[in-house]
From Swiss-Prot:
InterPro entries registered for this protein in UniProt: ACP, ACP-like_sf, PP-bd_ACP, Ppantetheine_attach_site
Annotated pathway: Lipid metabolism; fatty acid biosynthesis
Protein name: Acyl carrier protein
Protein family: Belongs to the acyl carrier protein (ACP) family.
Keyword list, A-Z: Cytoplasm, Fatty acid biosynthesis, Fatty acid metabolism, Lipid biosynthesis, Lipid metabolism, Phosphopantetheine, Phosphoprotein
Organism, scientific name: Deinococcus deserti (strain DSM 17065 / CIP 109153 / LMG 22923 / VCD115)
Amino acid sequence: MATFDDVKDVIVDKLGVDGDKVMPEARFVEDLGADSLETVELIMGLEDKFGITISDEDAENIRTVQAAIDYIESKQ
């Protein structure tokens, strides 16, 4: 199962944000300052970390930390 800490580690690594800013309700673009390239890198990082494939359509709907956790848990 995806844990908050595992997802947080990928976010901190890919977006270069302070871990204290990564909360379940945080939005990748608005709250964490991710640009379009960083969001693609984030999705790829989550795919690698959890051994899943995230379609482009699904990736567009993953906008918050909690949405990422929920999606990953639904695929495992």
